[in-house]
Amino acid sequence: MQRIRPKIALRGFKPGADGVAHVLGELESAVMEILWKQSGRSVTEVEDELRKRRNIAHTTVLTTLDRMFRKGYLSREKQGKAYVYSARYSREEFERGMAQEVLGALLNHYRTPALSAFVDLVGENEHTLDQLEAMIREKRRRGASRK
């Protein structure tokens, strides 16, 4: 499985949050949701969508989009005098990258307890356990075919 770049910062990991809010703030999560629904949006278009949920300053939206671009979460393209922003990764790619970073950090520091806890959690659901077994078989098959 290919790692997604950039690495997603884990400093703000929030276990009780939903979706990408585990690693992004509330505003950044809302921006990602907007851009996943429709890419290629200007600052004003993103602002209009955000204003449906909350009052927000134009400069806040502008700064947030620029910071998310610099973090590598968004791409942007100049159209006329303004930038148009898109999510750099699909929701699936972003979520996979987030999971890789979280699990990678746990495995790097707590390999045995992390694996044990993971197996315990997966083992609670027969279907999920079957999925894991199939993934392990596929990984071994691909690994063996490279030798």
Residue ranges of model-derived segments:
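Short beta-strand "wing" residues that participate in macromolecule-binding interfaces
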Residues: 76
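Glycine-centered, phosphate/nucleic-acid-interacting loop/turn motifs that mediate DNA/RNA or nucleotide
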Residues: 72
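Short alpha-helical segments that sit at the start of domains
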Residues: 2-33
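Short helix-coil junctions and helix-kink-helix linkers
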Residues: 48-56
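Short acidic, hydrophobic short linear motifs in intrinsically disordered regions
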Residues: 41-49
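Amphipathic alpha-helical dimerization/coiled-coil segments
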Residues: 97-142
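Short, hydrophobic-biased segments on the C-terminal half of alpha helices
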Residues: 62-66
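Short, cationic-aromatic polyanion-contact patches
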Residues: 24-27, 79-98
